[in-house]
Amino acid sequence: MTGTGYEFCNCDFGCGCNFGGFPNSKDGTCRGVVGLHIKDGTCGGVRLDGVKCAAIVEWPKAIHEGNGKCVFVVDPATTDQQIEALAQIFSGSLGGLPWELLGPTMQVIGLEKKKITIAGTGVKSTF
C-alpha cells in the first residue's frame, strides 16, 4: 500500500505521545486526527486505490492507558467493502504498526461519510 499520511494533535511541539509515552498538551489529553490518502493498495483483496479517510481520536490521558474514543470519516465514494477493510486495518486486527498498538486502546463511536479535501504538500498540507 502506498499513499500519504497526515497527523495533527493537540500536544505541544514534539508530541510526547510519540516520543515519551505521555501527552505534553496543556490539559494532559491526547486529541488528534490521523488522515490517509491511499494512492494504491489492497486489503484482503479489496482495492483501496484513491481512498481518503481519517480517524478523529481522543484519549483522556496517555494513549497506552486506554479509554480512547474514535470517529472514522471516509469520503462518500468509499464502498462498504472498503470501509470493512479499513476497519480491519485501523482496529489493529491485521497487525502492523501503529494500529496494532492503537486499535485496542480506543472504542469506535461513529462513522461519517463526508467529503475530505487535501490541499498543499509537505508541511504546508491541510486535511
What role is predicted for each listed range?
Residues 1-41:
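N-terminal ordered "arm"
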Residues 13, 25, 29, 41, ...:
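Generic detector of intrinsically disordered, low-complexity, polar/charged segments
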Residues 32-58:
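Short, intrinsically disordered, low-complexity segments enriched in Ser/Thr and Pro
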